[in-house]
A protein has these predicted regions:
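Helix-terminus loop motifs that line ligand-binding clefts
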Residues: 48-130
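Low-complexity, Ser/Thr/Pro/Gly-enriched N-terminal "stalk/linker" regions
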Residues: 1-35, 46-59, 64-70
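Catalytic cores of nucleic-acid ligases and guanylyltransferases
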Residues: 40
Length: 130
């Protein structure tokens, strides 16, 4: 378990690499993927940096593809791996719900719920009958 000082240092480090538009790369100026961005945003929420976490979800909101998912990797605004992964895309819903539970921010949930619905629709397109 992290001490309060360790938690603060961890979330401060995450916030230090977050860009103004909300993107959270693995390392400064490095690649970003939806799964790890959600993990980082959830850590920001645990550390009480709710506005920073919301900006991360806004980044995802603004880059959602028409079918409901995201590409696998981005550097800045450039797609560096156009692979589509339903597992990664669906994880965004976990983060959205975690942020809501951390903040009780119903305006955030209303803004992000269409994203959650779209990603579930996208993922369920790949569900098999067997």
């Amino acid at each position: 378990m992290l001490t309060p000082d360790e938690l603060r240092a961890t979330v401060d480090d995450i916030a230090s690499v977050q860009s103004a538009d909300g993107r959270i790369p693995w390392v400064p100026d490095g690649k970003t993927d939806p799964w790890n961005l959600v993990e980082a945003a959830m850590a920001l929420d645990v550390g009480g940096r709710h506005d920073d976490a919301a900006r991360a979800y806004d980044w995802l909101h603004d880059r959602r593809l028409p079918h409901g998912g995201w590409h696998s990797y981005y550097v800045g605004d450039e797609v560096t791996d156009p692979t589509l992964d339903t597992n990664v895309s669906a994880y965004v819903a976990v983060g959205v719900w975690h942020h809501y539970l951390s903040t009780d921010d119903t305006a955030f949930l209303r803004r992000m719920w269409p994203v959650v619905e779209a990603v579930f629709d996208h993922v369920l397109e790949f569900q098999s009958t067997t």
